Amino acid sequence: MMGQAHAEDSGPAIKVHVTQGESHVSADPQVVMTTVLGSCIAACLRDPTTGIGGMNHFLLPDSGDRKDGGDAVRYGAYAMELLINGLLKKGARRDRLEAKIFGGGKLFDGLSDVGASNAAFAERFLRDEGIPIVSSSTGGLSARRVEFWPASGRVRQRLVAVDNAPAEVRRPTPAVAPTANSGDLELF
């Protein structure tokens, strides 16, 4: 039996890596946006009618009472507004936007659960903005590698053992190593 073909399978992919504090928007069916997440959140937003979509990657929900010192891009509110405005500039309509959110893991034992705060912020922000979350994968103890094809809305998530994660999402090794969870999750 032949598998389902995807538009992005018809040629070489153009990979765009979205790092902490960044946001990217595209309608090109060959573009795949990628990121690796620990406690950070990536929001994948798109207008399914136009095929315009984008991804952001933020570290913290907000700056709290601290001065952000020019680091506003690290915070969720700014990152979400930047992504939404980028989509609208490309021709997406706000009333058609839908979201998929990923990340928010708890990778450091004994510390506050920044990942849960990040996930709660993203859910609250999107609800307040009237943007439906059509799928999500947040929380847990694993890092995630996320690939998003903005034109089709397809997302692939791979859980990453913390020992194999990039340095920015790695946590100290516990005395007893957790069992590896190597699940793939693909959302359409």
Curated annotation (Swiss-Prot):
It holds the Pfam family CheD. InterPro entries: CheD-like_sf, Chemorcpt_Glu_NH3ase_CheD, Cytotoxic_necrot_fac-like_cat. It catalyses: L-glutaminyl-[protein] + H2O = L-glutamyl-[protein] + NH4(+). GO terms for biological process: chemotaxis. Signal peptide: none annotated. Its EC number is 3.5.1.44. SUPFAM superfamilies: CNF1/YfiH-like putative cysteine hydrolases (SSF64438). Keywords: Chemotaxis, Hydrolase. One of its GO terms (molecular function) is protein-glutamine glutaminase activity. It comes from the Bacteria. Transmembrane segments: none annotated. Belongs to the CheD family. HAMAP family: CheD (MF_01440). Probably deamidates glutamine residues to glutamate on methyl-accepting chemotaxis receptors (MCPs), playing an important role in chemotaxis. This is Probable chemoreceptor glutamine deamidase CheD. It comes from Caulobacter sp. (strain K31).
